[in-house]
């Protein structure tokens, strides 16, 4: 019985491995390749005046890319737009979201002081009509509740003329 069980397990292993290899090839053949970037979590993009502005998480600073063809990010222009100087918001910069609101550019993001328990939402502002020009300046932290509990993943929208911020 032991020999039969051993033989069965060997055959099962060979059978599973060959099926897995075939499936992997099929998946790779049918897998869609992201035209933006192979890396970059929590991305945000906006289309404004014929250009796409794109940003994604980098943990220590915020970069902004601009392109006329969102599927050709390899030829986009990139600019470092924010490097935190305040230790309270200089670590774990997550989920930057770029928005144009009333002619000004804003990037909302979450950051902390090195302890992820202290994550808060911050916003930076650029007065320039072109976010690749001018300078983004810290507007401050956004109090999501009186206890300053954890705030991450900011997302803004307008409804009936009022601006709203969602977060988790």
Where are these regions (language model features)?
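Carbohydrate-active catalytic/glycan-binding domains of CAZyme proteins
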Residues: 16-168
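Bacterial Sec-dependent N-terminal signal peptides
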Residues: 1-24
